[in-house]
């Protein structure tokens, strides 16, 4: 398989319901093959067996009819920087990128469908779409899952459901999540109370790259915590309601800023745009924060002519691995910061 790592993923399109606040919607299904230990207990031969079975399954006509052409890429054939780009594009986890052994990623051309092979579970099927499209992502994931289950013997228990390495995934094996941009809630100091209240309704809040990461650039991921005893529709409907409520609260906070701190807000946005279009050195953390301010300005019509697609692409293109891959060489942190600033200036200049 020949990977086009610089391709823009489907989730970056920046169009769809609630796209002013909801960046992407993701459905992930955890599945394991019957008769084999979980990946953390497998030897390399067993890992290779899983990769081989998945490779055969994705070539089945039924799978093609359900989701189109899928291609498998063994991770051992990728350089560390190439693996890291897949993390930066939200296609694989940091754990899969870092691990050795027989591991793989399966991708559709538009990267809306991907499968991590031999991560925490044998298969982690993911459907990742732009904006608030959880139900559409679920339909795609469900079709892919049904087609794959026709080719693979998944570990399933009549009482407990799909068996997974982590007990919190047992049952449907489904993790639904949305990625939201919530700068006004942060600026008005409402983010802490609002987001901490979500844990009481079974919703987890994480940073830009999921579990264990910080909410850089005012971007948060919210997801369901438990799958056992709940149907797929219940999980998705609950997270959809939470996401829409969060988006409404963010809009209310934006209006509060507009009414009470209009000049400070416009100054903040203008300064951020000025730095991004003129800076010669930019760290990834500073760039993400400034892009958050500019995105807020674009969404509130303080800045005209910037579309969501470009801002979503920049979120990935400013990351260390993507920068080095596009430059065709390994860079020192300072070289990356200089290259990042030049790239941002060029892309914002249009």
From Swiss-Prot:
The keyword Methyltransferase does not apply. ATP binds at residues 24-28, 90, 124, 175-179, 206-211. GO terms for biological process: phosphocreatine biosynthetic process. It is an enzyme of class 2 (transferase). It comes from the Bacteria. Appears to be allosterically activated by the binding of pArg-containing polypeptides to the pArg-binding pocket localized in the C-terminal domain of McsB. Keywords: Allosteric enzyme, ATP-binding, Kinase, Nucleotide-binding, Transferase. This is Protein-arginine kinase. The lineage of its organism: Bacteria, Bacillati, Bacillota, Clostridia, Moorellales.
């Amino acid at each position: 398989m020949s990977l086009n790592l610089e391709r823009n993923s489907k989730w970056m399109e920046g169009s769809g319901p609630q796209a002013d606040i909801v960046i992407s919607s993701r459905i992930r299904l955890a599945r394991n093959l019957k008769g084999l230990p979980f990946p953390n207990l497998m030897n390399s031969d067993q890992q290779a067996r899983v990769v081989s079975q998945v490779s055969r399954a994705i070539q089945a006509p039924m799978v093609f009819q359900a989701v189109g052409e899928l291609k498998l890429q063994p991770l051992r054939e990728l350089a560390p920087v190439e693996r890291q780009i897949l993390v930066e594009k939200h296609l694989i986890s940091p754990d899969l990128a870092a691990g050795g052994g027989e591991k793989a990623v399966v991708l559709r051309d538009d990267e809306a469908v991907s499968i991590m092979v031999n991560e925490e579970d044998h298969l982690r099927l993911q459907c990742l779409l732009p904006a608030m499209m959880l139900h559409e992502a679920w339909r795609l994931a469900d079709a892919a899952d049904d087609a794959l289950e026709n080719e693979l013997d998944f570990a399933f228990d009549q009482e407990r459901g799909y068996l997974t390495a982590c007990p919190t995934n047992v049952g449907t094996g489904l993790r639904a999540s949305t990625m939201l941009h919530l700068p006004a809630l942060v600026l008005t100091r409402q983010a802490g109370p609002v987001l901490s209240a979500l844990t009481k309704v079974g919703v987890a809040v994480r940073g830009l790259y999921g579990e264990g990461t910080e909410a850089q650039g005012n971007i948060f991921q919210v997801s369901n915590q438990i799958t056992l005893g709940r149907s797929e529709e219940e999980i998705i409907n609950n997270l959809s309601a939470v996401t829409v409520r969060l988006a409404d609260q963010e809009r209310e906070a934006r209006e509060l800023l507009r009414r009470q701190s209009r000049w400070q807000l416009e100054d903040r946005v203008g300064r951020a745009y000025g730095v991004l279009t003129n800076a010669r050195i930019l760290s990834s953390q500073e760039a993400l924060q400034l892009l958050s301010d500019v995105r807020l300005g674009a969404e509130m019509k303080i800045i005209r002519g910037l579309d969501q697609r470009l801002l979503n692409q920049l979120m990935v293109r400013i990351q260390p691995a993507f920068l080095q891959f596009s430059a065709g060489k390994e860079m020192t942190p300072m070289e990356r910061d200089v290259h990042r600033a030049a790239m941002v200036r060029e892309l914002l200049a249009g």
